[in-house]
Amino acid sequence: MKRTRKILLGTLIGLVLLYLVLIIIAYLPYKTTPVKELIGKEDKFIEVDGHAIHYTKQGQGKSLILVHGFAGSTYTWRYLIPLLTDDYTIYALDVLGFGLSDKPPDGNYDMKSQGDLLIGFMDAIKLPSATLVGHSMGGVIIACTDLAAPSRVDKLVMIEPGFYIKTVPAFLKYMFFPLDRIMSRQFYTKSMRKRFLLGSFYDKSKVTEEVIDAYMIPTRTPNALDALTHMMNSVGSQTYEGISVKISSPTLILWGERGAGVPPEVAKRLNSEIQGSKLVSVKECGHYVQEEKPEELVKAIRNFVK
């Protein structure tokens, strides 16, 4: 009996010590850089629902708003924007929790809230309507905007939209503290980001050290880790069923044929569910169509928006 009690006590002490070690690992120093030190000449900020939202504005003509995907930023549009500024006014923004925008630790990061934030952004810049362009998670966000305020949407352009697939594994939703934060730390390491990008690009040569470093910059801004942890716990395993059939705006869907991001059946399903939508397949291209095939994307956008 005494031996059993000692074993149980030893096990309990061991578990407590392990838990304390995990907490220490989760909260190891995480160096951050103030956003103000990262601002360039093209960067602008505007308050939306009490949050500072980062965006850029370039060009002249019909208005296009570009919305990045999960763990992305305005950086993903660096090749696309210069090809459109002659004929379009391009707004590229960082959604809440990413890029240089605010990252409240307890923010509302579900796609409906992000879609509403996009409407708030348009209100703030006094833009009545625009064509919305969304990549991956951004495709879901702009769809939510269309559902909430169809009169504000001229057309939708969805690039590898993240419908019906989980942003992160479902088990993360049930991870107890502090394992959730440890997983978030791991996701925001350079090695993980490199692996993520290499798995998403068809042309691996485009995933250079410079590109990886640029993608890492927003992960080192204040509250980035806290926001990601909250995001993964609250919305990471949602698949957003039932949204596509309610979309009313003219919609263009682009799919990279060699990507691991969005399976072909998802693109085809969306095409069948969104009434009157057009599906364009991009050959020899992965998940990041805007970075691998910007010229083809621009051609498709011009033909669709004209």
Annotate each PLM feature.
Residues 51, 56-100:
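Conserved HGGG/HGGXW glycine-rich cap/lid loop of the alpha/beta-hydrolase fold
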Residues 139-150, 156:
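Short glycine-enriched nucleophile-adjacent loop
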Residues 48, 56-58, 92-133, 299:
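Active-site loop/oxyanion-hole signature of alpha/beta-hydrolase fold enzymes
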Residues 147, 156-185:
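Flexible "cap/lid" loop of the alpha/beta hydrolase fold
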Residues 1-62, 87-88, 128, 305-306:
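Alpha/beta-hydrolase fold catalytic core
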Residues 18, 30-34, 168, 172, ...:
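Conserved alpha/beta-hydrolase catalytic His-Asp/Glu region
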Residues 247, 253-255:
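Short beta-strand/loop motif that positions the catalytic acidic residue
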